[in-house]
C-alpha cells in the first residue's frame, strides 16, 4: 500500500520548491512504485481542495501533466516560475497536475492488478 501525503506549504517555500516536491516528487513516486506494485496493491495520493479553486487548465496544456515523461515534467512551459503568479498558484497547479497524473497512472497500475486513486479533502479548521 502507498499513501502519498508528502508536500510543502505555499506559505513556507518558493515556487520552484513547491513544483519539485509536490509535482515532480509525486510523479517519481507513482512511476517507481507503479513498476513494482503487486497485484491487489493500492495507492492513494492526497490532493487538496485548492486544486479546484483555480480555472481549468487551458486546452494547449491539456493532458501534458499526465503524459509528459517524469524527467521532463518541470520543463513544461506553463510550469515555469515566470508563468506562475505566486506560491499559492504553484501549489494549486502542482495539485491539479497531480490529479491528471494519477488518472493516467491508474491505468498503468491497473495493468498490474493494482488500484490508484486520489482524494482531495475539503477545508478543515485547525488551531494553526
Task: Describe the residue ranges of each PLM region.
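Catalytic loop of short-chain dehydrogenase/reductase
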Residues: 7-12, 35, 39-113, 121-126
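A hydrophobic alpha-helix adjacent to the NAD(P)-binding/active-site core of NAD(P)-dependent oxidoreductases
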Residues: 18-19
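Alpha-helical elements of the RecA-like P-loop NTPase motor core of helicases
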Residues: 27, 126-127
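Short, conserved SAM-binding segment of the class I
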Residues: 28-32
Amino acid at each position: 500500500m502507498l499513501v502519498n501525503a508528502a508536500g510543502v506549504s505555499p506559505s513556507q517555500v518558493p515556487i520552484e520548491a513547491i513544483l519539485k516536491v509536490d509535482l515532480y516528487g509525486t510523479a517519481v513516486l507513482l512511476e517507481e512504485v507503479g513498476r513494482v506494485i503487486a497485484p491487489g496493491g493500492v495507492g492513494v495520493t492526497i490532493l487538496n481542495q485548492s486544486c479546484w479553486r483555480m480555472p481549468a487548465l487551458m486546452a494547449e496544456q491539456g493532458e501534458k501533466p499526465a503524459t509528459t515523461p517524469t524527467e521532463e515534467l518541470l520543463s513544461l512551459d506553463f510550469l515555469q516560475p515566470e508563468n506562475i503568479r505566486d506560491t499559492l498558484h504553484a501549489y494549486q497547479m502542482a495539485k491539479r497536475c497531480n490529479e491528471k497524473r494519477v488518472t493516467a497512472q491508474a491505468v498503468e497500475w491497473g495493468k498490474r492488478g493494482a488500484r490508484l486513486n486520489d482524494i482531495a479533502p475539503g477545508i478543515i479548521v485547525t488551531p494553526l
